[in-house]
């Protein structure tokens, strides 16, 4: 006597497929769901409170408050914005130093230009800008907080931002005893200090993303 194979009812098969499709759609909607709207006052307060954890809180507030609407209350977006601010300042400063940061009369006399300590400093700050932009880009690829990928990428950002801060410090050291006719050395140093402070603040905000940093 032949044995008849029993096939699952068509209805059950349909329900299984429908359930799988529903789960897939739900997961996709959660991953693409926009962040809840944050009021301007709440976003500004978040920036203000977050900046208290930095070494230069007033500098932090002034530079990041314009980013508050885009940041909302996201520590990750705030750190990313701070890295971009640091990179922009490094680019501006390296361009200024690359021109010698001197008056036209001193350039004609050979006091300006990219030679010596100023030129080395400009090159160093270009390295700092590259590291900070690389760090900001890495922040976009970090993934879910607490995951191995997050920890790995966060470690990269911490390493690169720390190196950028070292670059700024090296530049300041090279200008400590620098002097040239017609060159406003104080103006040079102030610009480099601005880079150093912005980078220090960015690194502090990045470190706040590390759960081990609070232990």
Task: Please place each PLM-identified region on the residue numbering.
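Folded extracytoplasmic luminal domains of secretory or organellar precursors
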Residues: 2-3, 28-215
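Cleavable N-terminal signal peptides of Sec/SRP-targeted secreted and luminal proteins
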Residues: 7-24
């Amino acid at each position: 006597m032949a044995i008849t194979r029993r096939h699952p009812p068509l209805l059950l098969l349909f329900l299984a497929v429908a359930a799988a499709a529903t789960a897939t759609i739900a997961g996709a909607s959660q991953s693409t769901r926009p962040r809840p709207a944050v009021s301007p006052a709440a976003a500004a307060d978040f920036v203000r409170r977050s900046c208290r954890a930095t070494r230069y809180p007033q500098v932090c507030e002034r530079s990041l408050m314009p980013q508050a609407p885009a940041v909302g209350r996201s520590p990750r977006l705030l750190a990313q914005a701070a890295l971009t601010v640091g990179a922009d300042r490094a680019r501006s400063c390296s361009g200024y130093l690359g021109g010698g940061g001197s008056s036209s009369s001193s350039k004609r006399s050979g006091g300006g230009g990219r030679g010596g300590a100023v030129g080395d400093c400009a090159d160093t700050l270009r390295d700092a800008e590259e590291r900070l932009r690389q760090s900001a880009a890495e922040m976009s690829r970090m993934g879910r907080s607490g995951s191995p990928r997050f920890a790995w990428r966060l470690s990269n950002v911490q390493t690169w931002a720390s190196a950028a801060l070292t670059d700024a410090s090296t530049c300041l050291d090279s200008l400590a005893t620098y002097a040239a006719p017609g060159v406003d050395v104080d103006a040079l140093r102030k610009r480099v200090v601005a880079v150093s402070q912005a980078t220090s603040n960015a690194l502090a905000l990045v470190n706040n993303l590390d759960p081990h940093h609070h232990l």
